């Protein structure tokens, strides 16, 4: 009996560490995909979302925070720094007005950014640590969970009001309109769980099971988004990487919620 409990605990710790790895490496992929995206825009004489001098500082801060988080050095502080860096860069890109996106694409982009910020706040609370030396900050974790709830509300909203998202689900998931409504209800229920703070572990477990097929069939269908909906290739790859980071957050909360 004791060996079964020990093996189960070991497995949960291993899965939790996997979630931490996916989340802490997310900024590396974000910086790489942004560099590739802005290189493509430079060839077409188009501007990046953030002016170039500030862009280098922004990416430097992201890589610095991601490096320390990955090595587990002052992870809580650098997770908080990563959340702040991402919030500032997103705000700067939004008010800069250098690139204009469609409303449906803004919802996809900014909702994922909000979820990643929430993931960093969850990490800054002390969740996902194998050997916790300090007590967990429940306020930071609750705030991160609220951000995840906001992301899920945006996904549910897109399923009802964005024809681009609806077609992505209709074309690549069986069940047609009924499946869309089931996903809408499921996203809404999960959002309520994260926003209220009740049944968070169960909601995170469901989300961790739900996200991989959605990432594979919806976000991973680059041909649909790039060729049909004219989303820039590396922008879609960045969104896909953020979905992986959100999955990592769900895994952390599912195993250490």
From Swiss-Prot:
The protein's topology relative to the membrane is: Multi-pass membrane protein
Q: Sum up the protein's function in the record's words.
A: May activate NF-kappa-B signaling pathways.
Taxonomic classification: Eukaryota, Metazoa, Chordata, Craniata, Vertebrata
This protein's UniProt keywords? Membrane, Transmembrane, Transmembrane helix
- InterPro entries from the UniProt entry: TMEM101
Membrane-spanning residues? 21-40, 52-72, 77-97, 110-130, 139-159, 182-202, 206-226, 233-253
**Gene behind the chain:** TMEM101
Asked whether the UniProt record includes Hydrolase among its keywords, one would answer: no
Q: Where in the cell is it found?
A: Membrane
Q: Name one GO cellular component term.
A: membrane
Q: Output the superkingdom of the source species.
A: Eukaryota
Q: What is this protein called?
A: Transmembrane protein 101
Give the species. Pongo abelii (Sumatran orangutan)
Q: Which GO terms describe its biological process?
A: positive regulation of canonical NF-kappaB signal transduction
Q: Which Pfam families match?
A: TMEM101 (PF15111)
Name where it mostly resides. membrane
